[in-house]
Amino acid sequence: MGGIAAVAGFYPGSRVRGAAPESPRIGAITQVTHDGFGKTDLVADDSQVYVSELDATNRVIARVDAQGASRALLPEYSFPKSSDEQGSMTNLRALGLSADHTKLLVSSKQTSGENEFWSVPIAGGAAKRIGDVTGRDASWSADGAQLVFGKGAVLYLANAAGLKVHELYRASGSVFAPRFSPDGHVIRFTVRDAEQNTTALWEVSRDGSKAHALLGNWAAKSTACCGSWTADGRYYIFQASQSVPNTTTVVTKLWAISSSREDGLNDSEPVELTSGPMSFGNVSAGRDSKNLWAIGVQPWAEVVKYDASRNEFVPVVPGLSASDLEFSADGKWITYISIPGGKLFRARADGSEKLQLTSGSGLAALPRWSPDGKTIAYVSLKPGESWKLFLIPAKGGVPQAVSAESGSQIDANWSADGKRLMFGDFNHDAAGLSIRILDFKTHKTTMLPGSEGLFSPRWSPDGRYLAALAPDSTSLMLYDFTEQKWSKWITASGAVNYPVWSADSQSLYFDDLIDGVESIRRVKVGQSEPEKVLEVGNLDRYMGALGVWSGRAADGSWMFVRDKSTQEVYQLSLELP
């Protein structure tokens, strides 16, 4: 690897050399890595950066010289699988450094979030399990005496050995990215509200008292996430997203707030440290409070389809960065969601005659063509609001809400004649789930009997069947409109994602992301054993607002979204008052 390269452009930190800053600023920004690997978690000291990287089949931890002069994968850590065998940890996440910087706190990333935490020597050797605790995310205190970790909606505190575990705080959503202040007195963490599509920064004292949200009425507080203290404890650096004025682009920026007040609240708004066009996140502060390290991201999502004759994935529309692409019934038009930006577009099947249909601060997702090709239904994801379905003319116009009823709405399904629209809920509470059908003639919405507790509805093309999922995403239910009866169709070994009916309404296909190799599976009406029809293999899939997406092209081939984003480590010089 070569040396670091300066990143050109204006940042809020630009100033006259030698002038004392009145507020935190970023000076030089330099690119440290140039390897092209996807990156997630990052921890750093002043000489080394440890970053979780995605190769073709695994998540590994790379150690990178802070000046970009060298890069090496850390050894595979041995850990006891049983009393008589040894194994190697895979899919690693770098979560933190020990006080003496000789050990890494790591976990194995799993979709369930029930990860074990391990202390592993940087120089190689046997890893040590930290008690029997499990969770999503964890962090050591600066003195190494305690471990804080999040599991579901609960923040826990334990000693360094993972013992003496006790509940510290119970939040209203899932908790992650906990970080001790350098003096160990308080812990800041992120709470995610999945239904509202928001995140929020919180603080709690080490003894569990004085829990409160940060940032007051700041406009971007609903996207704030994942912070890191400067080593001197004077500032807390975090990430939050904002729309670029007069564009469809959303940029994740780094911000700073002072920690001078004991209650963690500040009269002034956070100070903007980066302004784009690149997004920055996963920030880690150096020991001297003079440098930050972060992952810089330039998102690019390529919709591809599987070409069986060539046994490879090929672009659907070359040069287009998008997700959630759907063809009109006649195959002549497409609708899709732009990446970045999350806006709804319509275009010819070859990408020409492109027309932007939505604007504003919200994201669009899951567009669905009406049978006559005149209208597109889509879901609007606005932070702090329930997800709602809208209809918009394919030629452009003003979006119209599908229903004024409260609660979330998602997964629009048109009836074959276009006179009705079926949709479901997005809600983690099974008691609040149901499936409804809107009649455009009467403007009445009715709940499908027996659909309580079900979501992700899929109407068969002939109108006879409805497939829907139980909250565990593995139990697939089937409703027969002719017999007006529900029955359990299958219980999958992995999660059922993005189900799609066959054109003849006799089979349902779904994306299996968990059961071994990612694959497309098919189950026929009247049968209960899914069969594998396509292995996705090592395709690097883009993670969008609703996870990884799949669908079917006009020719029946399978479509996926390949992640072609650039993710590299950057060093940002920090200038403090």
Where are these regions (language model features)?
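Predominantly a core beta-strand signature of beta-propeller blades
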Residues: A28-I29, A69-A72, G125-K128, L163-E167, ...
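Terminal hydrophobic membrane-targeting helix
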Residues: T30-Q31, K39-V43, V49-D65, A69-P75
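Cytosolic linker/terminal segments flanking nucleotidyl-cyclase catalytic modules
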Residues: M1-T30, F37
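Residue-level "micro-hotspots" composed of small/polar
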Residues: S259, D263, V536-R541, R562, ...
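Ankyrin-repeat and related helical/solenoid repeat scaffolds used for protein-protein interactions
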Residues: S502-N538
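Short loop/turn segments that connect beta-strands within beta-propeller blades
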Residues: D65-A69, P121-G125, N159-L163, S205-S209, ...
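Conserved beta-propeller blade repeats
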Residues: G36-S52, S78-S108, R129-G150, L155, ...
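Structural motif
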Residues: T57-A62, S112-W118, A153-Y156, Q196-W202, ...
